[in-house]
Amino acid sequence: MIKGRRTKLHTFLYDCFLIFAFMVGLPRILYKRFVHGKYTKSLGIRFGFKKPEVPGTGPVAWFHGASVGETALLLPLLKRFMKEYPEWRCVVTSCTESGHENAHRLFGPLGVTTFILPLDLSIIIKPVVRAISPSLLVFSEGDCWLNFIEEAKRLGATAVIINGKLSANSCKRFTILKRFGRNYFSPVDGFLLQDEQHKARFLQLGVDKEKIQVTGNIKTYTETLSENNQRDYWREKLQLAQDTELLVLGSVHPKDVEVWLPVVRELRRNLKVLWVPRHIERSKELEALLSKENISYGLWSKEATFAQHDAIIVDAIGWLKQLYSAADLAFVGGTFDDRIGGHNLLEPLQCGVPLIFGPHIQSQSDLAERLLSMGAGCCLDKTNIVKVITFLLDHPEERAAYIQKGAMFLHEEKVAFDRTWESFKRYIPCVKI
């Protein structure tokens, strides 16, 4: 029996909680389904009507991440895993449609099975887990689901969290239900965490300290796209002249757009802008706003280029990182919205591009502080944004300094991946083929 395993009553109460949460969110789900067309492809698998199949023979390693960023960080680890353990079959799941689409794009060419994780109701998830029968579970950053992991553990799987983190808010919620917190994490065999702060939070919830290792943040370890051929390729594809400046506004939310529209209007120089909304269903709203400002724009889906337009809206998923490499400056969205707290601050650095972001970075405050202390990023506020952008565009040597510091940051952090991999190998079970 798994230490700390929940009773049938715990499972029943947990299922009741999920049903209650689902009913509370149902109006929003229906709105997105019928107004924005979301969830059309995922309902069958989410409710267990469609059973995923994993072709081939051999043990199964099941990797899971909540959404786009969490699944993307699995790529280098999974590539290494497939190279050193070719007898294993691999599965990658995500909780969101955007995460699944990105996972399919990244992992599909590698022969990896990808699908959206079904709802964690015991009656739905347990038959799926039994059908796949994984020998290894790998959770990106800690997006564990109780019925999912408990059923896999019952079948003998090993479970490990990589790049693990626990926010202060999540820690508070688990602390209120401390006993529940212990049960939540007790089935996990290993915790490979980002830093000591996250370790302290897991310990506070009663996780066995022998299970925990601080291996570093592996979001910093992906293939760098900053080589000249990448930059030149994307600038040529976008039809950008050599002396034309490009500002990429990545993963922007409405509040980011609200800040940037007057800035772009005021700058009005030899500057092109690539708008990448966090949610592509907001592309129509962005089109209306640009039209209102008399800004000439085209759509990425229509193969628009800057030869005809001053702005391009990227109305497709999965292109942001490649397009960052063409930029002279890259802004990371969600950082002018205090409800969001920012997205992946590292992607511009990995593309060899100067990083700028707004003041709301609470979702990754530790990382932002490290970047700022090293001079690898620039934090803007609404009062100085035009002045700072103008200064950076007028002084290429300042942009070059940001790029250099960013490269140093990534080089120093690369060792985190090596530490994570060496620790992760200890949890890969020896399975008879």
From Swiss-Prot:
It is a single-pass membrane protein. Its main location: membrane. The chain crosses the membrane at residues 11-31. It holds the Pfam family Glycos_transf_N. The record marks 141, 219 as: Transition state stabilizer. It catalyses: lipid IVA (E. coli) + CMP-3-deoxy-beta-D-manno-octulosonate = alpha-Kdo-(2->6)-lipid IVA (E. coli) + CMP + H(+); alpha-Kdo-(2->6)-lipid IVA (E. coli) + CMP-3-deoxy-beta-D-manno-octulosonate = alpha-Kdo-(2->4)-alpha-Kdo-(2->6)-lipid IVA (E. coli) + CMP + H(+); alpha-Kdo-(2->4)-alpha-Kdo-(2->6)-lipid IVA (E. coli) + CMP-3-deoxy-beta-D-manno-octulosonate = alpha-Kdo-(2->8)-alpha-Kdo-(2->4)-alpha-Kdo-(2->6)-lipid IVA (E. coli) + CMP + H(+); alpha-Kdo-(2->8)-alpha-Kdo-(2->4)-alpha-Kdo-(2->6)-lipid IVA (E. coli) + CMP-3-deoxy-beta-D-manno-octulosonate = alpha-Kdo-(2->8)-[alpha-Kdo-(2->4)]-alpha-Kdo-(2->4)-alpha-Kdo-(2->6)-lipid IVA + CMP + H(+). Signal peptide: none annotated. Gene3D superfamilies: 3-Deoxy-D-manno-octulosonic-acid transferase, N-terminal domain, Glycogen Phosphorylase B. Pathway: Bacterial outer membrane biogenesis; LPS core biosynthesis. SUPFAM superfamilies: UDP-Glycosyltransferase/glycogen phosphorylase. One of its GO terms (molecular function) is Kdo transferase activity. InterPro entries: Glycos_transf_N, Glycos_transf_N_sf, Kdotransferase. Keywords: Cell inner membrane, Cell membrane, Lipopolysaccharide biosynthesis, Membrane, Signal-anchor, Transferase, Transmembrane, Transmembrane helix. One of its GO terms (biological process) is lipopolysaccharide core region biosynthetic process. Its EC number is 2.4.99.12, 2.4.99.13, 2.4.99.14, 2.4.99.15. Belongs to the glycosyltransferase group 1 family. Glycosyltransferase 30 subfamily. Involved in lipopolysaccharide (LPS) biosynthesis. Catalyzes the transfer of predominantly four 3-deoxy-D-manno-octulosonate (Kdo) residues from CMP-Kdo to lipid IV(A), the tetraacyldisaccharide-1,4'-bisphosphate precursor of lipid A. Thus generates the genus-specific LPS epitope of Chlamydia, composed of the trisaccharide alpha-Kdo-(2->8)-alpha-Kdo-(2->4)-alpha-Kdo. This is 3-deoxy-D-manno-octulosonic acid transferase. It comes from Chlamydophila psittaci (strain ATCC VR-125 / 6BC). The lineage of its organism: Bacteria, Pseudomonadati, Chlamydiota, Chlamydiia, Chlamydiales.
